[in-house]
Amino acid sequence: MKPVVALVGRPNVGKSTLFNRLTQTRDAIVADFAGLTRDRHYGNGRLGKHEFIVIDTGGFEPDAGSGIYKEMAKQTRQAVAEADVVIFVVDAREGLSAQDHDIANELRRLGKPCVLAANKAEGMHDGTKLVDFYELGFGDVHGVSAAHGQGMRDLVELALAPLNLPDPDDEADEDDVNKPIKLAVAGRPNVGKSTLINTWLGEERLVAFDLPGTTRDAISVPFERNGQRFELIDTAGLRRKGKVFEAIEKFSVVKTLQAIESASVVLLLLDATQGVTDQDAHIAGYILESGRAVVIAINKWDAVDSYQREQIQRQIETRLPFLKFASLHFISAIKRQGLGPVWQAIAQAHKSATRKMSTPVLTRLLLEAVQFQSPKRAGMFRPKLRYAHQGGMNPPVIIIHGNSLEHVTEAYKRFLEGRFRKEFDLVGTPLRIQFKSSQNPFADKDD
């Protein structure tokens, strides 16, 4: 198993920058505002042959007594509990603070191995500015610069050294079959994304707080159900323009879209009390454009009456007609109602998105469809469809070869899609059909 390293420290000491450096990503939002990271944020790090999991935490204030900061402190304690080792991050430029002492006392109480990293130490060659940090009682102080990549290798080697890690070459690679299904939970702010994942996980790992957009970043966590492994991704949701922290929220939009791109299946979560909004339609459109398998869940179904239920079902038909292939589920995340069928739909959507289709079967279905209903003539030419093969998965792509295929109508494409979907039981996934014509336009001229 990969060792787990938690990054802990007061707000704005550069934990997210260090996280990004260790994982070689931009997964954590970085900007000059205190308190940006409010949930535990997981990423994969690597040092030489050794891989490890890094947890980025919110700014730790052990004595926070109320509101979101209390929740952040709770998240940090849970991260330390999950970790094999803690990197305690302090700010070399600002120097030692009373808050650093409070965190040090809390870390000693929690009892995990700890390495002290003084971040923002670029240019401090003599180390005299780091002397005060020895008061914290964690031994050597390691000056690093996450922004410039200085001291990273030494820091990680020191953190991993006590763990006596086995040689990764001695461990067998995991079979592709056992790789987790990546599931993104996407939707507007405050539709219940974090509440749903928390219900599934049985712990409050994501901060589900009564503020629109509380989860600002895409958070990924492992999960298992009925023997199937999943990686659940809660996204920040898409914000209207003009909200607070606009620069951060714009970056979060990018992370939401990247989460959709990286997922195998997307659960599109709508709010029954608000109906289908323009933002919902935009998110749905992006999911379709990305080619991801999708399941639609209407949350807070218990909070609306029968008239509102009819209204939202009509709205889905009229505003999201391009997601007809997706199954629709009515749930209450907070009351745990209707969640079982959602899992079945997710599994079915993933199976459909990764379905393998043989060339002989595809070609047989194509020729049977043409025999049942020929494509319409376009001027002198009638499209001739000759054979088909699979061109990709997730989404499934079917490539049809023949002559004058540029004249195939949209209606006929929908007809073919319906035949293929029925034969292969493709539910919850887009199906892309591509046409490749012969170079000789006269080869298919009707006599």
Swiss-Prot record:
<feature type="binding site">
    <location>
        <begin position="9"/>
        <end position="16"/>
    </location>
    <ligand>
        <name>GTP 1</name>
    </ligand>
</feature>
<comment type="similarity">
    <text>Belongs to the TRAFAC class TrmE-Era-EngA-EngB-Septin-like GTPase superfamily. EngA (Der) GTPase family.</text>
</comment>
<comment type="subunit">
    <text>Associates with the 50S ribosomal subunit.</text>
</comment>
<dbReference type="InterPro" id="IPR015946">
    <property type="entry name" value="KH_dom-like_a/b"/>
</dbReference>
<feature type="binding site">
    <location>
        <begin position="56"/>
        <end position="60"/>
    </location>
    <ligand>
        <name>GTP 1</name>
    </ligand>
</feature>
<dbReference type="Pfam" id="PF01926">
    <property type="entry name" value="MMR_HSR1"/>
</dbReference>
<dbReference type="GO" id="GO:0042254">
    <property type="term" value="P:ribosome biogenesis"/>
</dbReference>
<keyword id="KW-0342">GTP-binding</keyword>
<feature type="binding site">
    <location>
        <begin position="299"/>
        <end position="302"/>
    </location>
    <ligand>
        <name>GTP 2</name>
    </ligand>
</feature>
<dbReference type="InterPro" id="IPR032859">
    <property type="entry name" value="KH_dom-like"/>
</dbReference>
<dbReference type="Pfam" id="PF14714">
    <property type="entry name" value="KH_dom-like"/>
</dbReference>
<keyword id="KW-0677">Repeat</keyword>
<dbReference type="InterPro" id="IPR027417">
    <property type="entry name" value="P-loop_NTPase"/>
</dbReference>
<protein>
    <recommendedName>
        <fullName>GTPase Der</fullName>
    </recommendedName>
</protein>
<keyword id="KW-0547">Nucleotide-binding</keyword>
<keyword id="KW-0690">Ribosome biogenesis</keyword>
<feature type="binding site">
    <location>
        <begin position="234"/>
        <end position="238"/>
    </location>
    <ligand>
        <name>GTP 2</name>
    </ligand>
</feature>
<dbReference type="InterPro" id="IPR031166">
    <property type="entry name" value="G_ENGA"/>
</dbReference>
<dbReference type="GO" id="GO:0043022">
    <property type="term" value="F:ribosome binding"/>
</dbReference>
<feature type="domain" description="EngA-type G 1">
    <location>
        <begin position="3"/>
        <end position="167"/>
    </location>
</feature>
<dbReference type="GO" id="GO:0005525">
    <property type="term" value="F:GTP binding"/>
</dbReference>
<comment type="function">
    <text>GTPase that plays an essential role in the late steps of ribosome biogenesis.</text>
</comment>
<feature type="binding site">
    <location>
        <begin position="119"/>
        <end position="122"/>
    </location>
    <ligand>
        <name>GTP 1</name>
    </ligand>
</feature>
<dbReference type="InterPro" id="IPR005225">
    <property type="entry name" value="Small_GTP-bd"/>
</dbReference>
<feature type="domain" description="KH-like">
    <location>
        <begin position="355"/>
        <end position="439"/>
    </location>
</feature>
<dbReference type="InterPro" id="IPR016484">
    <property type="entry name" value="GTPase_Der"/>
</dbReference>
<feature type="binding site">
    <location>
        <begin position="187"/>
        <end position="194"/>
    </location>
    <ligand>
        <name>GTP 2</name>
    </ligand>
</feature>
<feature type="domain" description="EngA-type G 2">
    <location>
        <begin position="181"/>
        <end position="354"/>
    </location>
</feature>
<dbReference type="InterPro" id="IPR006073">
    <property type="entry name" value="GTP-bd"/>
</dbReference>
